[in-house]
């Protein structure tokens, strides 16, 4: 650390390199924060979490009880032990509450004045954060599994929606209607994700074992169908042009948008080149996944090397994205974890589980440990680097 600081001060190193190195060190030390609680509001499992990208202060959660909760993550009390309080919630008594399980919540990427939620009640709702009223409601014929707004788009306000049907629907927030439909999958759409690098590139994952990349401006179908065999002849004809050997229920782009991570019920996670569609063949080993619906996992941002956080039963597995090495298992929940979200400003992780709890995972604090001996002289508390090195031995000798 001192060498990084010295090199930055003298102009030999890019300041960003020091920041990335420190962020990496903090992520590798993530542990359950025993001094921070998240207020328990949900009466059943927590399915989805999202932290707004503007300040990184407010977090949304959606549960199997249909409730949506907004939390303030900032420690306003300045006390070592504190609870992240729920600012407000769309509870069971709210007139616009979802009737069934909420599967996805997401903040509007550009400010905190609006957020969205989708549910098994076949609706996507757009909320005014200030009034906590539904500003718009999109109704579908099928159960909604997933939705996503582009974090990078500046020329459109499209929300991609995956339902129990095989068609991906694009809803336009400006017009308040479904603008068009993407056809190509054969079964339900379990996960959708816009590229953080390109405005119009969308990835979709389905129970038909396929992952497709789309340019939504094109009318001629998808750009790519990801093939786990990279075009080589497979042993079974039915596995041709499939990303996994089971349902694909999780998608996540890396922060730079150059790669795409997918997870399937075949207990495998794969890393793809998002430009060419090639399987990079990184081996993550067995990644347990028994979820029958979408699984929300997260990728780090701002580190020297990227990390991915994947729900793994009642734990969260931490992998190095490009090497496949499993670095840690975060243990704290009592039941299966269904979602996690990364907070890049402070390198923190939040996870939601079927045990109804939301847990905070934070880097370790490196505060000095006080000396147990109260009678020890004050100079023993000094850092040796700052101690006086003068000695009278020369005069005595």
UniProtKB/Swiss-Prot annotation:
GO CC field: Cul4-RING E3 ubiquitin ligase complex; Cul4A-RING E3 ubiquitin ligase complex; nuclear matrix; nucleotide-excision repair complex; nucleus; perikaryon; site of DNA damage
Compartments (UniProt record): Nucleus; Chromosome; Nucleus matrix
Gene Ontology process terms (BP): double-strand break repair via classical nonhomologous end joining; proteasome-mediated ubiquitin-dependent protein catabolic process; protein autoubiquitination; protein polyubiquitination; regulation of transcription-coupled nucleotide-excision repair; response to auditory stimulus; response to oxidative stress; response to UV
GO MF, one example: ubiquitin-like ligase-substrate adaptor activity
Loss of function: phenotype: Ercc8 deficient mice develop normally, but show a loss of retinal photoreceptors after 4 months of age, and enhanced UV-sensitivity.
Classification via SMART domains: WD40
Pathway: Protein modification; protein ubiquitination
Modified residues (Phosphoserine): 391-393
WD repeats: 41-81, 97-137, 184-224, 243-282, 332-371
Keywords, ordered alphabetically: Chromosome, DNA damage, DNA repair, Nucleus, Phosphoprotein, Repeat, Ubl conjugation pathway, WD repeat
InterPro entries on file: G-protein_beta_WD-40_rep (IPR020472), Rad28/ERCC8/Ckn1/ATCSA-1 (IPR042238), WD40/YVTN_repeat-like_dom_sf (IPR015943), WD40_repeat_CS (IPR019775), WD40_repeat_dom_sf (IPR036322), WD40_rpt (IPR001680)
Origin superkingdom: Eukaryota
Subunit structure: Part of the CSA complex (also named DCX(ERCC8) complex), a DCX E3 ubiquitin-protein ligase complex containing ERCC8, RBX1, DDB1 and CUL4A; the CSA complex interacts with RNA polymerase II; upon UV irradiation it interacts with the COP9 signalosome and preferentially with the hyperphosphorylated form of RNA polymerase II. Interacts with ERCC6/CSB (via CIM motif); promoting recruitment to lesion-stalled RNA polymerase II (Pol II). Interacts with KIAA1530/UVSSA. Interacts with a subunit of RNA polymerase II TFIIH.
Free-text function comment from the UniProt entry: Substrate-recognition component of the CSA complex, a DCX (DDB1-CUL4-X-box) E3 ubiquitin-protein ligase complex, involved in transcription-coupled nucleotide excision repair (TC-NER), a process during which RNA polymerase II-blocking lesions are rapidly removed from the transcribed strand of active genes. Following recruitment to lesion-stalled RNA polymerase II (Pol II), the CSA complex mediates ubiquitination of Pol II subunit POLR2A/RPB1 at 'Lys-1268', a critical TC-NER checkpoint, governing RNA Pol II stability and initiating DNA damage excision by TFIIH recruitment.
Record's protein name: DNA excision repair protein ERCC-8
Gene source species: Mus musculus (Mouse)
Name of encoding gene: Ercc8
